[in-house]
From Swiss-Prot:
Positions with a binding annotation for substrate: R96, R106, R135, D224
Subunit structure, interactors included: Homodimer.
Annotated protein name in UniProt: 3-isopropylmalate dehydrogenase
Keyword Oxidoreductase: yes
Gene Ontology molecular function terms on file: 3-isopropylmalate dehydrogenase activity; magnesium ion binding; NAD binding
Gene: leuB
Reaction(s) catalysed by this chain's protein: (2R,3S)-3-isopropylmalate + NAD(+) = 4-methyl-2-oxopentanoate + CO2 + NADH
Organism: Nitratidesulfovibrio vulgaris (strain ATCC 29579 / DSM 644 / CCUG 34227 / NCIMB 8303 / VKM B-1760 / Hildenborough)
Family (UniProt): Belongs to the isocitrate and isopropylmalate dehydrogenases family. LeuB type 1 subfamily.
GO biological process: L-leucine biosynthetic process
Length: 357
């Protein structure tokens, strides 16, 4: 198979970690007889510095004509004083919209080799943590209109609109059920249906979709309880599906309790065009250019790209196995370093994983 990948290195540590991701991708291609072509485009702060825009038209076109997109990270304090519409993060929101990416899949798994880093009580961690948060990306209170700040009766008043239509709910629910079907066949839909009309529609539509998946178990949970249950007993979850706002919060919570946020990948997918794959961590400008960044989340994002973007499960499994082997051999970047382990830098970690493909 030939794969045409658009690289968006972005800001901070982005270029360093994307370089390691492509190194591992090349190793996979050699082993399995594939070919890869890559092109790089600007996004975020790097794009602002070069063009004045966080998402140049040329970047959108490069992404649209690719088979998949691999992103590093965007943002940094250098651009914090810009107007909100000109900041680096607008580039990420913009490319998601331009590519029609409505579903964000964020796995949160506890690596046995890093069990000591888990923030949960030992008995809870021992029960395991292996779940996926499927978050709707393009609707909800983040994009609903009207929204703004205005003066009412002499008082400044802020307002947003939480809104979903049934088609938006239906398509994200199908992604969740399809994801669960390839895992442990359990979906937990998270909402606030006891208070919000939006959530009542959400629950109704998810139940309608569930009828097409009789082999998948569906449960419902209010978001406040879900936040508690993620800490209390995360082993109960397989796939969590929820809206944009709740998903933003819960996916970060699920990630951080693993204790190794530098290890976790993500995918943003649409309905037919190229998908976008990226690590969940930020641009870490404080360590940029110092060979300190952990590239494993980006490398695992390449694995997600192979699995979800190209249907290459064996190739994705090879990446997962190589990462586990390197960790089992005791190699660590600074963010996951433990006593008695071997400290390595960004490039060395990429080399070690690529050599074990």
């Amino acid at each position: 198979m030939h794969m045409n990948i658009c690289l968006l290195p972005g800001d901070g540590i982005g270029p360093e970690i994307v370089a390691q991701g492509t190194k591992v991708l090349d190793a996979v291609a050699r082993r399995f007889g594939h070919t890869v072509s890559t092109s790089s485009a600007l996004i975020g702060g790097a794009a602002i510095d070069a063009t004045g825009s966080p998402l140049p038209d040329a970047t959108v076109e490069a992404c649209r004509t690719s088979d998949a997109v691999l992103l590093g990270a965007v943002g940094g304090p250098k651009w914090d004083d810009l107007p909100s519409e000109k900041r680096p993060e607008k580039g990420l929101l913009g490319i998601r919209k331009a590519l029609g990416l409505f579903a964000n899949l964020r796995p949160a798994a506890l690596f046995p080799e890093l069990a000591g880093a888990c923030l949960l009580r030992a008995d809870i961690a021992a029960a395991g943590l292996d779940l996926v948060v499927v978050r709707e990306l393009t609707g909800d209170v983040y994009f609903g209109q009207p929204a703004g700040i205005e003066t009412r009766d002499g008082l400044r008043t802020g307002f947003n609109t939480m809104i979903y239509d049934e088609d938006e709910v239906r398509r994200i629910a199908r992604v969740a059920f399809d994801t669960a079907r390839a895992r442990k066949r359990r979906v937990c839909s998270v909402d606030k249906a006891n208070v919000l009309a939006t959530s009542r529609l959400w629950r109704e539509v998810v139940e309608e979709v569930a009828r097409d998946y009789p082999d998948v178990e569906l449960s419902h949970m209010y978001v406040d309880n879900a936040a508690m249950q993620l800490v209390r007993w995360p082993a109960q979850f397989d796939v969590i599906v929820t809206g944009n706002l709740f998903g933003d919060i819960l996916s970060d919570e699920a990630a951080v309790i693993t204790g190794s946020i530098g290890m976790l990948p993500s995918a943003s997918m649409g309905s037919g065009g190229p998908a976008l794959f990226e690590p969940i961590h930020g641009s870490a400008p404080d360590i940029a250019g110092q060979d300190k960044a952990n590239p494993i989340a980006t490398i695992l994002s390449v694995g997600m790209m192979l699995r979800l973007g190209f249907g290459l499960a064996a190739e994705a499994d090879a990446i997962d196995a190589a990462v586990r082997r390197v960790l089992a051999e005791g190699y660590r970047t600074g963010d996951i370093m433990e006593n008695g382990r071997t400290l390595v830098g960004t490039v060395s970690m990429g080399n070690l994983i690529a050599e074990r493909i």
